[in-house]
Structure formats: structure tokens, C-alpha cells
Amino acid sequence: MANIKSQMKRIRTNEAARKRNQSVKSALRTAIRSFREAAEAGDKDKAAERLQFASRKLDKAASKGVIHPNQAANKKSALALAFNKL
């Protein structure tokens, strides 16, 4: 445990950020999983809706700094490729 006052605050701040980032990443994984399930089922309408939702989640995660913008772009590209194969 830190003895310095500013470091104690950083520990609390980092913990709050970690929980927030964890929540965003979890929601992101859920959105991607729901798209993949719709795509595997062959439901094009539902897959299109979930692709849009997953893309929005990826963009938000990238803008918040939870994931790198290039990672978001790569994942969106892979999801779009999977959608176009339907």
C-alpha cells in the first residue's frame, strides 16, 4: 500500500477506471457475441441490427480509450466481412 497521499488517490482512481473499463469491455463482448449468434443462425435482419449496435459499441470503446482505435476498426471490419457472407 502506498504511503504518499497522491499515490493513494491514484490507486482509488485507477480502481474506478478499471471497473469502468471492465464494464465497457464486457458489454462490447456481449454485443459482438450476439451479432455472431444472429449471423450463425442466418437471420440477416437481426444480424444487421446487431452489427450496427456492435459497431456503435466498438466506436464508443475506442473513443473512451478502452480499446485502441485500430483494434476497433479491425473488429468492425471482421464483423462486416462476416455479415457480407450471409
UniProtKB/Swiss-Prot annotation:
BP GO annotations: translation
Cross-referenced InterPro entries: Ribosomal_bS20 (IPR002583), Ribosomal_bS20_sf (IPR036510)
GO terms for cellular component: cytosol; small ribosomal subunit
Gene Ontology terms for molecular function: small ribosomal subunit rRNA binding; structural constituent of ribosome
Chain positions covered by the region annotation Disordered: 1-25
Keyword presence, RNA-binding: yes
Keywords for the protein's UniProt record, in alphabetical order: Ribonucleoprotein, Ribosomal protein, RNA-binding, rRNA-binding
SUPFAM superfamilies in UniProt: Ribosomal protein S20
Sequence similarity: Belongs to the bacterial ribosomal protein bS20 family.
PANTHER family in the record: 30S RIBOSOMAL PROTEIN S20, SMALL RIBOSOMAL SUBUNIT PROTEIN BS20C
Functional note: Binds directly to 16S ribosomal RNA.
Protein known as: Small ribosomal subunit protein bS20
